[in-house]
């Protein structure tokens, strides 16, 4: 009988508790340890495990203590904490030699991404960033077909995403810049940026951006005009206030086809020539742990790799720099 993979959790908030409801039923894994600075959050996740009839995981207030004491008792770690903590915690997990499933976004800056990549290369562990779009069958199929040349050359990209985010997260840590790493563009908008980075299969070359905080401490609206290193042009628009709801449209204009898809990979429309194929829909993944395990076993492409995270970080750093300079063009130098 195959031994279960021993899972450690860093950040036992609502997202982790939500996922735990399904993960605790998986025969492949068991919750072995968890760390959170809040006792209520730790107990909530422990209660999920106990309610499922599984052993109680060890609880820690400090993730560093968990890694120090349980390093030999863990196989994989899931990190779900405010964005600004990702880099330090992810790097510590990699240095401990443990495979990592990391909530999006991977890190907040290029410098953090480079440090994490160095730790990953030294230890050889698997690191996957949990973007729904990156794990979506429709997004991955689109990537495969684009790379195979089915759609022709990429000409341009138009991406839009919106949500009643400003009011939805009023007072939330996501609107505290010291721990969020950014506003709407870096939170919900991150899904759009990541799907664009993944499907464009190219780093960005130059970026011009504007942001409007609309009275908040973080960006609520963002407009980006950019050129990619493969020659394609792109516009990205993020509106973090409006009527209730959340949606996205991204259009990829190729020389042989037009592909429309949402940031999470929930639907796709493809037009080839004068023929428009019916809209395809796919369930946005409710249990991404299964995909993480498939990637870990080499059965699935790692679309959430540290290298993809670096591409994303380069774009985000350039957007921030340009917006701070009132839209001045910023050139991205990718090593």
Predicted regions and their residues:
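Short amphipathic alpha-helix with an adjacent loop that forms part of the alpha/beta core around
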Residues: 63-73
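Predominantly a Rossmann-like dinucleotide-binding segment in NAD(P)-dependent oxidoreductases
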Residues: 133-210, 215
């Amino acid at each position: 009988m195959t031994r279960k993979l021993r899972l450690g959790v860093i950040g036992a908030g609502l997202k982790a508790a939500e996922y735990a409801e399904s993960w605790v039923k998986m025969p492949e894994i068991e919750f072995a340890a968890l760390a959170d600075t809040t006792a209520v959050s730790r107990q909530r996740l422990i209660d999920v495990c106990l309610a499922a009839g599984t052993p109680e995981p060890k609880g820690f207030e400090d993730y560093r203590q968990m890694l120090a004491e349980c390093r030999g008792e863990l196989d994989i770690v899931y990190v779900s904490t405010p964005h600004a903590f990702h880099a330090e915690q992810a790097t510590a997990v990699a240095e401990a030699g443990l495979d990592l499933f990391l909530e999006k976004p991977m890190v907040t800056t290029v410098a953090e991404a480079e440090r994490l990549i160095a730790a990953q290369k030294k230890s050889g562990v698997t690191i996957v960033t949990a973007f729904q779009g990156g794990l979506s069958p429709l997004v991955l199929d689109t990537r495969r077909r684009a790379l195979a040349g089915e759609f022709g050359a990429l000409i341009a990209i138009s991406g839009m995403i919106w949500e009643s985010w400003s009011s939805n997260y009023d007072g939330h840590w996501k609107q505290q810049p010291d721990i969020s790493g950014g506003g709407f563009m870096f939170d919900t908008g991150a899904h759009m940026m990541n799907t664009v980075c993944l499907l464009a299969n190219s780093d960005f070359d130059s970026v011009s951006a504007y942001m409007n905080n609309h009275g908040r401490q973080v960006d609520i609206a963002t407009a980006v005009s950019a050129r990619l290193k493969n020659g394609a042009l792109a516009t990205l628009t993020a509106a973090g206030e409006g009527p209730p709801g959340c949606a996205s449209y991204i259009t990829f204009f190729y020389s042989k086809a037009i592909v429309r898809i949402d940031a999470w990979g929930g639907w796709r429309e493809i037009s080839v020539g004068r023929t428009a194929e019916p809209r395809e829909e796919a369930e946005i993944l409710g249990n991404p742990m299964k995909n993480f395990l498939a990637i870990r076993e080499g059965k699935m492409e790692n679309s959430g790799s540290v290298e993809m995270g670096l591409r994303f970080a380069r774009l985000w750093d350039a957007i921030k720099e340009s917006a701070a300079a009132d839209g001045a063009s910023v050139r991205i130098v990718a090593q």
